């Protein structure tokens, strides 16, 4: 898919998404971070916000692989107006947490990327992460705590102002 951003820069969003997924799968944080602007932000559904290329690279190389291995990430049906890119995804990994006992767990979601000059300025997602948490074998109380944190984060977003009044 090709998109033209407001500055007239032509972007191959299919190539961007392919490299995005591939860099995570091969544990290449530096390549992943290069897809972002210098001041880019990645909002992870589990770990929170990572700001700047160095922190984003550390997220992939350290945080993601601390308790998981053998990542698989695929993006489908991208839609973009040149400023925002949406894509449905499937994501799985082999969890190394004791509760998971080496099981492959996964979930799906939608990636939302704000773009600037052909790079990702901000990444966030709407993820069915509770599916993966249950597959890991987390206790219901632990899942509830994680979901409560995500709910609080969502309600701080400006789009929620009208719903929170």
Model-derived segments and their meaning:
Residues 17-20, 24, 36, 60, ...:
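Hydrophobic alpha-helical core bundles mediating ligand binding, dimerization, or RNAP-core interactions
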Residues 29-33, 37-83:
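A solvent-exposed, acidic/Ser-Thr-rich amphipathic alpha-helical stretch
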Residues 68-69, 93-104:
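Short, cysteine-centered beta-strand-loop-beta hairpins and adjacent loop/turn segments enriched
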Residues 1-38, 143-165:
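Short, low-complexity N-terminal intrinsically disordered segments enriched in polar/charged residues
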């Amino acid at each position: 898919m090709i998109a033209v951003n407001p500055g007239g820069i032509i972007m191959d969003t299919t190539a961007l998404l392919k490299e995005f997924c591939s860099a995570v799968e091969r544990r290449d944080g530096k390549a992943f971070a290069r897809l972002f602007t210098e001041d880019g932000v990645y909002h992870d559904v589990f770990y929170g916000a990572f700001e700047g290329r160095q922190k984003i690279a550390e997220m992939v190389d350290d945080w993601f692989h601390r308790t998981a291995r053998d990542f698989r990430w695929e993006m489908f049906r991208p839609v973009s107006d040149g400023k925002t890119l949406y894509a449905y995804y499937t994501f799985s990994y082999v969890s190394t947490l004791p509760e998971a006992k080496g099981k492959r767990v996964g979930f799906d979601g939608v990636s939302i990327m704000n773009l600037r000059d052909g790079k990702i300025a901000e990444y966030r997602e709407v993820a069915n992460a509770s599916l993966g948490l249950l597959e890991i074998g987390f206790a219901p109380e632990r899942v509830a705590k994680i979901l409560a944190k995500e709910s609080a984060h969502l309600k701080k977003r400006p789009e929620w102002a009208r719903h929170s009044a």
